[in-house]
């Protein structure tokens, strides 16, 4: 196959989206944008990106940020392990590299939360290094371009695609080339629905287009079934109209984040909820059920039963705090898993 770079780059320079991390592609900006975009659409991530940079304009500021403020800046993006790893990496960068990301692929790859793709994006876009940056968009483009039925989630297949990506990469324009492939996959060689082949600069070279197999590609491994977990969520409110929050364990699902009272296992009845509250030293003065809800994580689905409970005046149990509505809005971060109950909390 002839080299795709000339046609691809010509298309990219004419059609690329104007994005803040492209107009000012400092290593920190590219790093932050790539972490945010791992599980979030560009349009949804942009307001968070701007707000985050306004509060934490450089790596030392990120490294020094208090945990609650950091979580609050990330609130709404989900997958909070991303921002925890972001801060862990920032602290290492401050300790070992003077607060500036290293211009070295392997050194970037060694930082928490930075994998092959993110290291390649930073290294090529910000530092001009001739390295690959292969994400799902790029794998899809090359799967169709070569009409390759390989399962792209398999490591050996991904390595083979990466080698093909590098065969076409112009070393002096590595960052632009990598971004162009990502952009082509995002705007033209799209994942859902028919690809926009008539707009593609590589249409004349695309083997899947000739074979009529573009809609069938790429091939992925079948996803694992999610585990269903019933949980009971309790919005406990005291006489001062404060809500009880408990902090989750520092490891595992939603690590270290705040949540309403929650019990895992079979859905609890109102009587069982009151009994558990009394065991915590909280008197159940009134209780009413809330609508059932669910939340899907990558590997777990919560089926939530909810109750709103008035408990009068009481000390917060161990591991819990009372939080006013104002504090809930400005200080504490509740994960998106509790979206169905946020209106009741005044959020």
Feature annotation, model-predicted:
Residues 1-18, 23, 186-347:
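Intrinsically disordered, low-complexity, charged terminal extensions of DNA damage-control enzymes
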Residues 2-198, 202-211, 215, 283, ...:
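Catalytic cores of DNA base-excision repair glycosylases
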